[in-house]
Amino acid sequence: MSNIWSKEETLWSFALYGTAVGAGTLFLPIQLGSAGAVVLFITALVAWPLTYWPHKALCQFILSSKTSAGEGITGAVTHYYGKKIGNLITTLYFIAFFVVVLIYAVAITNSLTEQLAKHMVIDLRIRMLVSLGVVLILNLIFLMGRHATIRVMGFLVFPLIAYFLFLSIYLVGSWQPDLLTTQVEFNQNTLHQIWISIPVMVFAFSHTPIISTFAIDRREKYGEHAMDKCKKIMKVAYLIICISVLFFVFSCLLSIPPSYIEAAKEEGVTILSALSMLPNAPAWLSISGIIVAVVAMSKSFLGTYFGVIEGATEVVKTTLQQVGVKKSRAFNRALSIMLVSLITFIVCCINPNAISMIYAISGPLIAMILFIMPTLSTYLIPALKPWRSIGNLITLIVGILCVSVMFFS
């Protein structure tokens, strides 16, 4: 049996699942619910290939490069395109996931202020205090160290997955099929909704940061056979991810009237908040919903924050060197944490709409790295020509459509 499927492959499947399913899963039903049933059904059809193809392409891109042990995306880009393009991709990578951190922080703040609003009037002063508390607490957890934080995150994965599955099954009793069947119409607005929903889908299913670690680990163990091992794990993991996420999305949208989804979208909160808004929502759902939403987004925040701080440290180091100042790595890192925290606090106070940030900034930037860079490279780099395929071409086209939302939406 171990020759067919090993314990290690099971652990990596859980790692991919735990990284992919989280805060993004809570935003996907909001966008798809407001976009209409046609967009929902199309998403269900394309979810697996548009999760598998881009992550597989990125894995191939990393594994095909002749880089030093332990080098991931940045090393691969530098190998193929040189140091300048490598630095550009590193900066783009930093910006893309810095925006993700901002989205999670804003959504956590909104979820907490929404609960406080039931007991008091929320003005700017209260929002500033909540924003400050969110930023400070998340930083305190982060400063516990990488290993301690990862242990906490790993401990939270299974309860979160169990909650999503339990809630999906629980809501089956409240399904109202007419909530979807009455929305089935295809017109010009449907095409527009499909277009602007692409970045949210990219955001929800993306787990780009772990792909470098995954590819490097497989290469160290299997060498030239690493890609076959990666594809084997990805096919199974992404099938489970897509089935469970789509079951959760359909279960929510078959239970929640569109007006509540629109209200949640306007407030910049997750689908769990939309569920708690329902008149007949049980008390346990409101309480557990806010806890799970905050925990899921905090887990995703911390998982992304490590990479953001590392990227910010490099940006600070380069900037200081350009003005003739050379400081220790500890100083650069401390300054990075302070600057990132300050910007996060300010954005939480301003309260931009989370969904709008996803489809206007975060989704398109992630698409540049995940959908466009590895697939376009198969047409630009002769050594990558064997990886050209219909799947890669479709991934490239979807990536370009996703990026176009940033400029034309």
From Swiss-Prot:
Residues in compartment: Cytoplasmic: 47-87, 149-151, 215-235, 298-329, 375-388
Transport as UniProt keyword: yes
Protein name (database record): Inner membrane transport protein YqeG
Species this chain originates from: Escherichia coli (strain K12)
Transmembrane segments: 26-46, 88-108, 128-148, 152-172, 194-214, 236-256, 277-297, 330-350, 354-374, 389-409
Membrane topology: Multi-pass membrane protein
Family, per entry: Belongs to the amino acid/polyamine transporter 2 family. SdaC/TdcC subfamily.
Gene Ontology CC terms: plasma membrane
Subcellular location: Cell inner membrane
Domain of life: Bacteria
Periplasmic face residues: 1-25, 109-127, 173-193, 257-276, 351-353
Molecular function terms from GO: transmembrane transporter activity
Keyword Cytoplasm belongs to the record: no
